[in-house]
Design a protein with these regions (language model features):
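N-terminal catalytic cores of NTP/NDP-binding nucleotidyl/phosphoryl-transfer enzymes
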Residues: 3-59
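Short beta-strands and strand-loop turn motifs
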Residues: 9-11, 40-41, 72-74, 182-184
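Short, contiguous strand/loop micro-motifs
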Residues: 12, 46-47, 63, 77-78, ...
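Non-catalytic positions within long, well-ordered alpha-helices that form the structural scaffold/packing
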Residues: 29-30, 64, 91-95
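Short acidic/polar active-site loop segments enriched in Thr and Asp
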Residues: 35, 69, 100
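Generic alpha-helix structural propensity
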Residues: 54-58, 66, 81, 85, ...
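A glycine-rich helix N-cap at a beta->alpha junction
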Residues: 61-75
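Active-site cores that bind ATP or allylic diphosphates and position pyrophosphate for catalysis
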Residues: 73-223
């Protein structure tokens, strides 16, 4: 791809596509003006097993109309699983398309911290046994992972985008993919319950849709 054109990957659900997603795409184009942006996206069902607000064809059209070049569908058997399995499939696909950088939103926006929280999980018997200990005490799997990371590194990974970011970086490290992770500061949390900004989370937009409230100020005009 030479020095000029960069192939950038994004992992997403676009459920639905909103101003925060558009902000991310604009930031990528600012940082890498001649980039090709490839998205790995869940289809008609999301990671939580819910039916997507829009079907995959509409989501794809909206993505293309807002600056994405290629949309890949994460197969259903991976896309409605845990963040680790979701990330495994997404990164495998994006690596096959030779992306050089993976860009994702992050609450902490600290790649070094997220990388440390990722690397401590790889081929680490101490980590594995800590996770088992926490699960035997009644914690669920994600909480056990978070507590084990904290015990070994002092890093607290609590926010949804950071959790996904750690999953992505872990896949990159584990598989020795030649992909550089790049974080963009998240302007809002997963559930902020505020209408002060025109960028709110997909979760909040789905809540507004459930209440038949208008979402037009939170999504691009072509959504």
């Amino acid at each position: 791809t030479g020095d000029f054109m960069q192939i950038i990957g994004i992992v997403t659900e676009y459920n639905p596509f909103h101003n925060g997603h558009l902000y991310q795409i604009k930031k990528i184009k600012e940082m890498y003006p001649d980039s090709v942006i490839i998205v790995a996206m869940s289809g008609n069902y999301t990671m939580r097993g819910e039916i997507s607000v829009l079907d995959k064809w509409n989501k794809t059209n909206i993505a293309i109309n807002n600056g994405i070049d290629i949309v890949l569908e994460i197969p259903f058997i991976y896309s409605n699983q845990s963040s680790d399995i979701f990330s495994y499939a997404a990164l495998k696909m994006l690596n096959e398309f030779k992306i050089e950088k993976l860009v994702f939103g992050s609450e902490t926006n600290n790649i070094d911290l997220l990388s440390l929280a990722s690397s401590v999980q790889i081929d680490n018997k101490k980590f594995d046994s800590l996770v088992k200990d926490y699960m035997s005490k009644g914690y669920n799997y994600p909480s056990s992972i978070g507590k084990s990371i904290y015990e070994l590194t002092g890093i607290k990974i609590k926010e949804s985008n950071d959790i996904l970011g750690v999953s992505y970086i872990k896949e990159i490290l584990k598989n020795k993919y030649n992909i550089k992770p790049i974080s963009i500061k998240r302007t809002n949390n997963f559930k902020t319950n505020t209408k002060k900004s025109n960028i709110i989370s997909a979760y909040e937009i789905r809540e507004f849709l459930n209440k038949n409230e208008s979402i037009k100020e939170y999504v691009p005009n072509n959504v």
